[in-house]
C-alpha cells in the first residue's frame, strides 16, 4: 500500500525501454536499495520477464514471494549458499532469452563491493549488465550491514537505468579483477552523482 504513495522520476540512460524483450539483460542493483525494485520493474517494464537472484536464507523467502507476484521467477542462492548452482541457473534463464536481476554485493556484503558471480555470469552469457540505481528523497536507514534504505511514504524515487556494461572475457586473475572493478566503478558512479 505504501508503495502507491511514492512518486517516480525515471532516467533511462541505458535505453532499456526500447530494448527488445528478445535481447536478455542483467540488471544490477545495490543490495541496500533493492526493496522496491520489483514494483519498479512491474510498473515501468511490465513486458520484461526473467528471474531474480534471491538469498537462500530464511530472510530471502518473503522477497522471493514478492518477486514472483510481479512476474519474475526467483533463483535461490548466494555467495555462501548454492552460489555456483544459482549462477548456472541464471545463465540458463539468459540463454532462454529472459532477463536476470542481481544485487551483486548481497546478501552479506561488504556494501558497494561486487562479488565475482555477476562477472562470471556476464562472461558466460555475453549479456550486458545494466546498472540500476534507486535514490529516495526521504528514507529511513536500517541498522544492517549495508544500512538498507526504506523509502518513506510520499517520497520521490529517482530511478536510473544506467548504460549497458559489457564485461570482457578474461584469461588471468588480474584481468578478471579489472573487469570486476570496472563494473563496480560504473555502479558507484550512479550513487556518487545522486
Label for each model-derived stretch:
Residues 113-172:
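A cross-family acyltransferase "interaction/gating" segment
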Residues 58, 80-83, 107-114:
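Acidic, metal-coordinating catalytic cores used for nucleic-acid/nucleotide bond scission
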Residues 77, 103, 131-134:
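Generic beta-sheet signal
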Residues 1-40, 154-156, 182-194:
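Membrane-anchoring hydrophobic helices of lipid-metabolizing enzymes
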Residues 89-121, 125:
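Catalytic-site beta-strand/loop segments enriched in glycine and acidic/polar residues
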Residues 23-81, 141:
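Catalytic core of membrane glycerolipid acyltransferases/transacylases, capturing the structured
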Amino acid at each position: 500500500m505504501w508503495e502507491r504513495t511514492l512518486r517516480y522520476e525515471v532516467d533511462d540512460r541505458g535505453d532499456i525501454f526500447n530494448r527488445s524483450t528478445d535481447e536478455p539483460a542483467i540488471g544490477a542493483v545495490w543490495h541496500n536499495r533493492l526493496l522496491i525494485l520489483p514494483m519498479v520493474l512491474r510498473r515501468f517494464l511490465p513486458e520484461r520477464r526473467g528471474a531474480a537472484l534471491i538469498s537462500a536464507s530464511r530472510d530471502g523467502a518473503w522477497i522471493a514471494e514478492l518477486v514472483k507476484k510481479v512476474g519474475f521467477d526467483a533463483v535461490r542462492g548466494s555467495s555462501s549458499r548454492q552460489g555456483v548452482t544459482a549462477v548456472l541457473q541464471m545463465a540458463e534463464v539468459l540463454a532462454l532469452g529472459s532477463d536476470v536481476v542481481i544485487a551483486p554485493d548481497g546478501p552479506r556484503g561488504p556494501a558497494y563491493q561486487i562479488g565475482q558471480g555477476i562477472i562470471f555470469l556476464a562472461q558466460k552469457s555475453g549479456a550486458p549488465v545494466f546498472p540500476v540505481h534507486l535514490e529516495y528523497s526521504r528514507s529511513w536507514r536500517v541498522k544492517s550491514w549495508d544500512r538498507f534504505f526504506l523509502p518513506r511514504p510520499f517520497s520521490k524515487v529517482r530511478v536510473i537505468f544506467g548504460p549497458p556494461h559489457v564485461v570482457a572475457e578474461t584469461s588471468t586473475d588480474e584481468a578478471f579483477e579489472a573487469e570486476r572493478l570496472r563494473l563496480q566503478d560504473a555502479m558507484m558512479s550512479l550513487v556518487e552523482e545522486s
